[in-house]
Amino acid sequence: MSNLLVTTIQTNLHWEDKAANLQMLEQKIKSIREKTEVVVLPEMFSTGFSMKPELLAENMEGETMQWMKRVSAERKIILTGSFICRDAVNGHADEAQSQMVQTAYSVPTHYYNRLIWMLPDGQYGVYDKRHRFAFAGEDKHYTAGTKRLIASVKGWKINLQVCYDLRFPVWARQQSQPEGPEYDVLIYVANWPERRNLAWKTLLQARAIENQCYVIGVNRVGNDGNGIYHSGDSMIIDPMGEILYHKKDEEDVFTISLDKEHVKTIREKLPFLKDADSFVVFNEGNTTDL
């Protein structure tokens, strides 16, 4: 079974400054010396967690998507993170949706906190954040997603989610399937404030234990434009809840090799998922293959 090389980038972000953020992140990606296959960026990595989509949103042919396509192709990596997207409908990782959003300035316009799973060949998967953070007004500015995205690479299945989704375990719950667990890695990209970092750290471990999977949480550091401090606390956790990586209060670029055999062994020795209640989240999500 192939291991999967994943790099996390915990960084400060320039408030609502796309050019500065994209330049900074490209330099950090270029600085990665180890071999890597997947690079994970924070939530709204090109702007910070802004409630000004009318000013900052792009369509699917905008600056951020073009940057992701170019960097992914040049570095031969999968690149993932979320940005502020303008679209007419929820995103779907299929050809019909791609064609629609490329020409979409149709009415009504919606704004999404949209995660992209970008492949080196320019294909991509889409996940629109399901749970909007009403405490900060996200529900007043952004439309909720309706579909999960489970991507596939090298025999690994990866469930991709965004920040506040972490508080809602049903959305991440392993679905009942004849072939076994639905995914092997659960990734959260975030702008999670330091004042609630205990919840962040605790829930990341809980999601790993209850779903018997690796969990990767990538958060930003520093103060945002509202003066809210983010301590980072990016983490990588194994299926037993063991913390493999944790970085607090500073920028960091970290690469890890995830072990598929380790996941398989834990699930065979402790087959807890087989005892779970059988239920289905209201959609089957999307799948992207590499």
Predicted region positions:
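Cys-nucleophile CN-hydrolase/nitrilase-fold catalytic domain and related Cys-dependent amidase chemistry
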Residues: 18, 26-120, 125, 193-206
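Short hydrophobic-aromatic micro-motifs
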Residues: 39-40, 157-162, 187-188, 216
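Extreme N-terminal starter segment of soluble prokaryotic enzymes
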Residues: 2-8
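Short polar catalytic/cofactor-binding loops
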Residues: 10-15
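CN hydrolase (nitrilase-like) catalytic-core segments centered on the catalytic cysteine
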Residues: 62-80, 166-253
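C-terminal beta-strand edge segments of enzyme domains
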Residues: 150, 220-290
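Conserved hydrophobic/aromatic positions in well-ordered beta-strands
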Residues: 7, 116-118, 125, 235, ...
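Active-site catalytic loop in hydrolytic enzyme cores
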Residues: 58, 70, 89-90, 99-178, ...
